Amino acid sequence: MKNSVGISIATIVAIIAAIYYVPWYEHFERKSPGAGEMRDRIESMFLESWRDYSKHGWGYDVYGPIEHTSHNMPRGNQPLGWIIVDSVDTLMLMYNSSTLYKSEFEAEIQRSEHWINDVLDFDIDAEVNVFETTIRMLGGLLSAYHLSDVLEVGNKTVYLNKAIDLGDRLALAFLSTQTGIPYSSINLHSGQAVKNHADGGASSTAEFTTLQMEFKYLAYLTGNRTYWELVERVYEPLYKNNDLLNTYDGLVPIYTFPDTGKFGASTIRFGSRGDSFYEYLLKQYLLTHETLYYDLYRKSMEGMKKHLLAQSKPSSLWYIGEREQGLHGQLSPKMDHLVCFMGGLLASGSTEGLSIHEARRRPFFSLSLERKSDWDLAKGITDTCYQMYKQSSSGLAPEIVVFNDGNIKQDGWWRSSVGDFFVKPLDRHNLQRPETVESIMFMYHLSHDHKYREWGAEIATSFFENTCVDCNDPKLRRFTSLSDCITLPTKKSNNMESFWLAETLKYLYILFLDEFDLTKVVFNTEAHPFPVLDEEILKSQSLTTGWSL
């Protein structure tokens, strides 16, 4: 069939295909792209990863994009929904704003929803990690329920019913000890809680204090106060049995014995096993308006500034170090990439989701030296984390850096281009983590400073150029982790973490949305957005803080 000027339909299709496919790689070479163009690019990156997973690993929890390998996490090979459940709210957010791929996003939402409803079964006779399953699976289901409702896409009941089933199974973990601090794992079929197999049975402090948002939101949706009460029980023994506010200035060692509530280690850090303890203090306040949690957060932030904060040489980059021997030990200049969430956390705590221009007109900000200090530090930490990308040979940050404090012996370590940090040989990997782009997103929407979009575009470009597989063929292109982001060319690893889809690409996408009201939503630690809860409904359900100091 031909049109009136004699060009065949096949030719037209070929021309459109060429326009559609060829320019994506070239587009990433451009500078200062518009917000709409960046959204299109990020949608394309997401869908290229998603299509590849759907074709070669659908339904499996773990996926290797290079070799198209897949497997499930629990013993017995039953799926937890690790990738699908973690990603469905990203599908929804992109569906809502997409101009190029709206119908494809809608179809994939429906496909995921059917799989969750018809295939996913949490009656699994195997141990799962309580923390990871809560933040990814329970959080993902609750966020999908929320977005399905407000965006009017899919069947919200599917997500809530599945969340209740999983929440009931996970809640049994809190009944395993007299303190209410759960063991690290639980058998989803039997309800048997299992201690950590290492570290003398101690639980990660961040893990059992990063369950509260999910269970409080579930309590709010169902009216079941038990969820709320169970997750609040962990705090009283933690604070009182350790004299946390006085002896530790609000800072927590990274392990806690669940049977006693006493700390089981000396190391204090804002990286792994410490990070989200601080995050959920603030976010419980933002989600539920409970002022106790802001007061605890405030104490922790002042403790961090007193004991952990330092600046690098030669550029005076602010970083949050570690105290490996407790508060009276030497400050280590080591910082995990995980710590880079702190820029966004400090900023959102400072303004409570308002733009900085609006917050400065409000007494809660204008009369608070601490909030002003938080805002300045948020800018500093976000800049530091951007420099971890900028000063890297690939434009991507490694998993861990050691900042130059003038005293470091760096034999065999890689030195950044300016010299502000070093990277040890075993810390060169890049898992496509979200924390830096998370903070960049918050800083942009709270300040409207365009430089943050420029930084985000640079990082997206570096991900595209360095983590893609079959880069020049859009039909086969997908993205994977790196075992080495320092040596050029970078070395790829056969694994795609679910947070690439659930967090990193989501935060990059939101960065380029024209409007995003951060006073209306609170993200859990896996980037699943929950709505700020209505105070009158909370009051009517008697959902209030159940402990005090």
Curated annotation (Swiss-Prot):
<feature type="topological domain" description="Lumenal">
    <location>
        <begin position="25"/>
        <end position="354"/>
    </location>
</feature>
<comment type="subunit">
    <text>Homodimer.</text>
</comment>
<keyword id="KW-0472">Membrane</keyword>
<keyword id="KW-0378">Hydrolase</keyword>
<keyword id="KW-0735">Signal-anchor</keyword>
<comment type="similarity">
    <text>Belongs to the glycosyl hydrolase 47 family.</text>
</comment>
<feature type="glycosylation site" description="N-linked (GlcNAc...) asparagine">
    <location>
        <position position="96"/>
    </location>
</feature>
<keyword id="KW-1015">Disulfide bond</keyword>
<protein>
    <recommendedName>
        <fullName>Endoplasmic reticulum mannosyl-oligosaccharide 1,2-alpha-mannosidase</fullName>
        <ecNumber>3.2.1.113</ecNumber>
    </recommendedName>
</protein>
<dbReference type="GO" id="GO:0006486">
    <property type="term" value="P:protein glycosylation"/>
</dbReference>
<dbReference type="GO" id="GO:0036503">
    <property type="term" value="P:ERAD pathway"/>
</dbReference>
<keyword id="KW-0256">Endoplasmic reticulum</keyword>
<comment type="function">
    <text>Involved in glycoprotein quality control as it is important for the targeting of misfolded glycoproteins for degradation. It primarily trims a single alpha-1,2-linked mannose residue from Man(9)GlcNAc(2) to produce Man(8)GlcNAc(2), but at high enzyme concentrations it further trims the carbohydrates to Man(5)GlcNAc(2).</text>
</comment>
<dbReference type="GO" id="GO:0005975">
    <property type="term" value="P:carbohydrate metabolic process"/>
</dbReference>
<keyword id="KW-0326">Glycosidase</keyword>
<dbReference type="GO" id="GO:0005783">
    <property type="term" value="C:endoplasmic reticulum"/>
</dbReference>
<feature type="glycosylation site" description="N-linked (GlcNAc...) asparagine">
    <location>
        <position position="155"/>
    </location>
</feature>
<dbReference type="GO" id="GO:0005789">
    <property type="term" value="C:endoplasmic reticulum membrane"/>
</dbReference>
<dbReference type="InterPro" id="IPR001382">
    <property type="entry name" value="Glyco_hydro_47"/>
</dbReference>
<dbReference type="InterPro" id="IPR050749">
    <property type="entry name" value="Glycosyl_Hydrolase_47"/>
</dbReference>
<keyword id="KW-0479">Metal-binding</keyword>
<keyword id="KW-0812">Transmembrane</keyword>
<feature type="glycosylation site" description="N-linked (GlcNAc...) asparagine">
    <location>
        <position position="224"/>
    </location>
</feature>
<comment type="pathway">
    <text>Protein modification; protein glycosylation.</text>
</comment>
<dbReference type="Pfam" id="PF01532">
    <property type="entry name" value="Glyco_hydro_47"/>
</dbReference>
<keyword id="KW-1133">Transmembrane helix</keyword>
<keyword id="KW-0106">Calcium</keyword>
<dbReference type="InterPro" id="IPR036026">
    <property type="entry name" value="Seven-hairpin_glycosidases"/>
</dbReference>
<feature type="transmembrane region" description="Helical; Signal-anchor for type II membrane protein">
    <location>
        <begin position="5"/>
        <end position="24"/>
    </location>
</feature>
<feature type="binding site">
    <location>
        <position position="525"/>
    </location>
    <ligand>
        <name>Ca(2+)</name>
    </ligand>
</feature>
<dbReference type="GO" id="GO:0005509">
    <property type="term" value="F:calcium ion binding"/>
</dbReference>
<dbReference type="GO" id="GO:0016020">
    <property type="term" value="C:membrane"/>
</dbReference>
<feature type="disulfide bond">
    <location>
        <begin position="468"/>
        <end position="471"/>
    </location>
</feature>
<dbReference type="GO" id="GO:0004571">
    <property type="term" value="F:mannosyl-oligosaccharide 1,2-alpha-mannosidase activity"/>
</dbReference>
<feature type="topological domain" description="Cytoplasmic">
    <location>
        <begin position="1"/>
        <end position="4"/>
    </location>
</feature>
<dbReference type="InterPro" id="IPR012341">
    <property type="entry name" value="6hp_glycosidase-like_sf"/>
</dbReference>
<keyword id="KW-0325">Glycoprotein</keyword>
<feature type="active site" description="Proton donor">
    <location>
        <position position="399"/>
    </location>
</feature>
<feature type="disulfide bond">
    <location>
        <begin position="340"/>
        <end position="385"/>
    </location>
</feature>
